[in-house]
Structures are given as C-alpha cells and as structure tokens.
Regions:
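Polysaccharide-binding and catalytic clefts of secreted carbohydrate-active enzymes
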Residues: 111-281, 285-288, 292-298
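N-terminal carbohydrate-binding accessory modules
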Residues: 1-48, 402
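Short, well-ordered coil/turn segments that N-cap beta-strands
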Residues: 16-18, 45-47, 81-85, 147-152, ...
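Conserved, mostly hydrophobic/aromatic
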Residues: 22, 41, 49, 78, ...
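Aromatic-lined substrate-binding rim segments of carbohydrate-active enzymes
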Residues: 36-39, 51-111, 244-251
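The substrate-binding groove and active-site-proximal loops of carbohydrate-active enzymes
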Residues: 20-29, 55-69, 116-133, 163-164, ...
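Short, acidic/polar
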Residues: 29-41, 264-273, 334-342
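Carbohydrate-binding surfaces of carbohydrate-active enzymes
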Residues: 284-581, 586
Length: 586
C-alpha cells in the first residue's frame, strides 16, 4: 500500500510549476559567494534546491555542539528569493568525530576489513549506535525547520545503498540472523530454502547463520544465502530510511518525504517497488551513458519510474548537465543534449528537473563533475543552456504540463529486482546474463518498432494489459507463474524471453525440463520442454559466437534444445547446429 501522494509546493504565487534546480552545497563556499549564487539561480529560472545533503559535520561539528546559523542564513536567503528548499536529513555522511568515538559504526567489506571513513555512507545501516546519532540529528532538524515556510520537502539520506549496500560487519551478521528467523521461523525451513545439504552446510540454529563473506578465491557462495543477503540489505536500508522519516514526521508531519532512487544504465540496485510505497513522491537520479542508445535507456528508466509512481508526477532529483567524473572515460554531453534529456524526462512524467550540482566544486572527489554553473562561470555555453532550459520548463509549466499523466501502453515489460539480483550470481551458466539490460533491450526494440511499452514491477498488478513480456525473468515463484497462467487464460498474451522461469524464489531449479516454473505450469503453457541449454560466444571455447535462425534472427548468448508439443506450440523459426560428434541439435 503506497503512502498518500503529496507533492512539494514551489514558492510561486500558486505553488505550482515544474521544479527546477539541483543539489546546492553552500558550505563548500564562503558566504560572499551566496548572493551571487542566488542571483544566478534567478537568472537561470531555478526555483528549488536540495540543501545539506552532506552537511552533518557543519551542523554538528562536535558531539555536544550544534551550529544551525549558516543553515538558517542560506535557507532564509533562498526563500526570500522565491527558491524552495528540499532539506536533507544530512545523514549521507557522518562527521569524523563520530567515527573516532565509535569505530564500531563502520561497515566491513566481504574480507572482514573495516570500510574506512572519509567518503560517504561509511556507516553500517544495522548499527544501533549510528542510528541513535542519526535520528537525533533528524529530530533536531525537524524541530528547527519543521514550520519554516521556505522548507517545502524533506530529502531523506542520499542514494541509499550506493556505498553501504553490502555490509559484512558483526552488526550486519546479528541483524541478518534476526531477519532470517523472522522470515523462516524455524532453522529447518531455512535449511530447506538454502539447500544446505549441498556441501554439508546444515545448521542447528539461527546462531549458526553466516553472512556471505569471502571464503577463498575458488569458493562459491550458496546462491540461496546470497539472494537472501540481497533481500536483507534492501530491507535494512529501507528500515533505516523509514526510521529517519518517522523521526521527522513525528515533529513535522505535513511536508512530503522522498529519497532519491538510482535507476539508470547500470544502477538498479534496490527493490524500488518496495521503496516506492514508503515515499510521498518518487524521485530518481539518472545518469546517461555514452552512445546511440542513450536516449532509449533514458526512456526505459523513466518508464519504470512512471510505474513506481503509479502514474503520478515524479522527481528527477539528479542528472548531469554534461560529463560525470566516476567512469573510466567521461564524455561530455553534446550541444543541446542537456535540454533534450531534461525535456525527455518531462515527457515521461517528471515534474521536477534537478541536477548534481548547482556550482561545480573546486575541490574534492567530484570536482570534475559537471554542474549548472561550471568552473568557467556564467559566461559559458553551458550556463546559457541552463538558462535556456529554465525558460523552456517555465513555458511548459505555464502551459499546464505539470500534473499530466502518461497514457498507458497495452504492453508491459515485467521487471523483477529479485531476478536482477539472481542474474548477478556467480553460479549461473553465464555471467553475461543481465535482467535489467534485457529489459532495456526489449524496451528499445519496441521503440524501434514505432511503439512504446510500459515497464512494470512483476509484483505489481499488470492484469489490465493486453501483453506482458518477461525478459530473462530467471526467477519465478509458483504464485507468479499462476498469475501468468490466469492472465493468458483471460485472453492476455505472454511473451517469454530466454532463461526465464528457471529457478524459484529460493534459487532452486524448477525440475522436469525448462522452463519449469510453477512445477511445470509455465512449460505446459508454452507447449515446449527444454532439455538443455548452451552458452554461445567467443569465450565459450568450441562454441559458435552466434546462431542464425531460419527467420533471419540472430542469437549470440543462449541456445536451447527444445522439444515441441505440436498440438500446443507452433514453430516459427528453426536452426541447425552441428558438432564434431554424432550429436546434432535442431
């Protein structure tokens, strides 16, 4: 059940318009720069900024000393200029004095080494000590700014899970054991789910449950254990977000809460279908990848965001005006792409266009990351594009674009965070399997065909669509397989991609032939029975790099040996693959 949709108002006469701005870090600059910042914001049409995302150390420079003076001044300066503030909980990074006093709040990597402080999210989400300090900060912020008219929304944390998604500390171990006990009830149920009779790993009690730390270069983690650790990491960070949100809501219940998801090219790390239920409006950080498919990937990510927002407006909390700085090679955007990408987000349902960050940093890890105001200042082609974009967004807002909804397609591509996690397993036939990338490829194929598909979480209700597509949905439960069967029986079309329905929710193989999901129900629906699959590619010694079908289509990764039930399945294309032995697959 989603929370009631609540959108942050702007400081305009009617509180409406398309929100435009970005992360603003005034504490990186001397106060004599602030007036110039506000002047340039007004010139560019900026009407909202996110403040204090990484400012805990400035707000609480020592354990028993608080300094809100600078934050008071900048919020007041912004608000009087008509610029709304999306105020952060400031917990994205903690002050160094906290780590010095309580080193036990640090997370650990899979080798058991503490993750040193000095970057962001260097804290364990399961640390009770860290949570106590973080919630104290949240309450202090709510008490001071909860009734401030210039603060129109709360920005909780920042990109939860980007740095501390996988924590192997003792805090995490203890929390994981409790999580497993709540999920399974008895150790017998856990042993069955994880298949611990393989390699002799049966446990006598939850006190013997381990997290999947490094076990040696040639060892593989139990895939069921690893999958549950993925779920656990998602749940622990979501619990931490909710604790922060609720601490502020107890004092300031009237303003909307959000946190920025990460859905883009290779960033879809959490089960955002769960997270979307806990925010008042959905927000996303989207960063482009170079190449001709960039705009298709943008539309694909936005299609998922639209579904997560249940068709309501959503927020682009971050994207880039030009180059980022965290890739091996960081290409700039070409002329017009900053405006094009932003308007594309609006066309896909976004009512807020924000960037990281307002002014390009002069120092630090992201100093070469592009911004609204570049290092060269206002007399630049980039800042002129920023002003052009601000004017375009105002025109769209004045025309009433805000609040409009996308028309639903008749086709849904189903996305499963758990299948995405499963395709990262080291125990699969190919490490090239990637559910999210296949979702993107299917989405692009629909665009190339002149139509558009929606992207809908598998766990949502998709029964109103005419067609559903499952691209590499490797994990299907019996319940979801039955939903597909009911959908097909009611006249819906089900398109099954390769490597779909091979395992259940515990990472157990569905037996009897592929795809065996639902104890063979999926296999019966399709009228086929796969005996064996084969991995293609140059890396697979002795195997072809591709197979060409009689229809002209080409496959380059996965080949199935399939038996067909002639009464229930019609063959549309065939192939012949000969080996040096007497065996042949056709």
């Amino acid at each position: 059940m989603h929370r009631t949709f609540k959108w942050p108002e702007l400081l305009t006469d009617n509180g409406k318009g398309i929100a435009y701005g970005g992360d603003y870090n005034p504490d990186q600059w001397s106060e004599d720069v602030w007036d110039d910042d506000v002047r340039l914001m007004k010139q560019a049409g900026v009407n909202t900024v996110a403040v204090a995302i990484f400012s805990w150390d400035r707000i609480q420079p020592e354990e028993n000393r608080w300094d809100f003076g600078w934050l008071d001044r900048i919020i007041d300066k912004l608000g009087k200029a008509g610029i709304a503030v999306d105020l952060a909980s400031a917990t994205a990074t903690a002050p160094l004095w906290l780590y010095e006093k309580h080193p036990e709040v640090l997370p650990q990597d899979k080798f058991g080494h503490p993750v040193n402080a000095g970057s962001r999210q260097s804290w364990s989400p399961t640390s009770p000590v860290f949570k106590e300090y973080a919630l104290t900060l949240c309450r202090k912020l709510a008490e001071r700014y909860g009734t401030n008219p210039y603060v129109t929304a709360w920005h909780m944390g920042n990109e939860y899970g980007w740095n501390n998604r996988y924590d192997y500390s003792d805090n995490a171990l203890n929390a994981f054991r409790l999580w497993c006990e709540r999920k399974y009830g008895t150790i017998e149920n856990l042993n069955k789910a994880w298949g611990t009779t393989f390699w002799g790993q049966e446990m006598n009690g939850f006190h013997e449950v381990l997290i999947p730390r490094f076990m040696g270069a040639d060892s593989m983690v139990n895939p069921g254990q690893k999958l549950d650790f993925e779920r656990f990491g998602n749940d622990m960070l979501l619990d931490f977000y909710k604790a922060e949100r609720d601490a502020i809501a107890e004092i300031c219940p009237d303003k909307p809460f959000t946190t920025n998801f990460m859905v883009s090219t290779d960033q879809c790390c959490m089960d955002y279908a769960d997270w979307a239920e806990e925010v008042d409006f959905v927000s996303n950080d989207h960063y482009f990848h170079e190449g001709e498919s960039h705009i298709d990937e943008l539309f694909c990510s936005d299609a998922l965001m639209d579904s997560l927002a249940l068709g309501k407006p959503w927020y682009v909390m971050e994207h880039s005006t030009s180059a980022v700085q965290w890739k091996p090679l960081n290409a700039r955007k070409r002329k017009g792409e900053t405006v094009r990408d932003s308007i594309a987000h609006v066309a896909m349902g976004a009512d807020a266009i924000n960037f990281f960050q307002w002014r390009a940093s002069a120092f630090g890890a992201e100093s070469f990351h592009s911004a609204l105001v570049p290092h060269a200042g206002e007399d630049t082609k980039l800042f002129r594009q920023v002003c052009e974009l601000g004017a375009a967004l105002k025109t769209l807002g004045d025309a009433g674009v805000q609040g409009t909804e996308l028309e639903q397609s008749d086709t849904a591509i189903l996305f499963s965070a758990e299948s995405e996690w499963a395709t990262r397993s080291e125990t699969l036939p190919s490490m090239k399997l990637n559910h999210w990338h296949d979702v993107r490829d299917w989405y692009r194929a629909f665009l190339n065909a002149g139509t558009r598909a929606d992207i809908v979480p598998l766990k949502y209700d998709w029964s109103a669509y005419k067609t559903v597509v499952l691209p590499t949905v490797i994990m299907l439960s019996a319940e979801d397989t039955q939903r597909l069967a009911d959908f097909a029986a009611a006249g819906g079309r089900v398109v099954i991609g390769y490597a779909t329905g091979l395992i259940d929710e515990n990472f157990h193989i569905w037996l009897g032939g592929y795809p065996g999901a639902g104890d063979g129900l999926l296999r019966e629906m399709l009228g086929i029975r796969g005996e064996e699959f084969n991995i293609l590619g140059a890396e697979a010694e002795g195997e072809p790099s591709e197979i060409r079908l009689s229809s002209g289509a080409v496959t380059r990764l996965w080949q199935n040996d399939v038996n067909v039930d002639g009464e229930r399945a019609q063959v549309l294309a065939t192939y012949c693959l000969l080996y040096t032995s007497d065996a042949a697959d056709d």
